[in-house]
Amino acid sequence: MTNVFGNVVNVKQYPLLDSNFRNHCKQKLDEDSVLVLDNFLTSLAIDSIKAEGKDNQHLAYFAEKNHNIYLLPPDAEFSPDHPRNREVVSSKGCITTDQIPDSSALRVLYEAPQFRDFLCAVLDIE
């Protein structure tokens, strides 16, 4: 793994190229339906990403939407107050990929072949 990638991901704790580690992660995800990788990013990367977000928040795209928690149309088979039909409002602000600086730790992570290969192995995507 490149030194730059090692500045973003805790590669000693998470050896993404190791097939045993990948298999363990896939098994954990399959069993628990979730995979938690505590301290996956270095504190330096987290601080950098947070600062970039703050510096670039003026570039964010903001959206608000009404929907149920399942993100599906209402279902007449359930009462109006059932979670399937209860409407919530969500709002979000997203900084789009083209607004992320080229030198960003986030871009390093997203564009790293070793990270994509790890995700494909764990998610069983070819």
Residue ranges and their predicted role:
Residues L41, S48-H58, P74-E126:
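Signature of the catalytic double-stranded beta-helix
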Residues M1-D81:
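N-terminal auxiliary "cap/dimerization" subdomain that precedes the catalytic jelly-roll/cupin core
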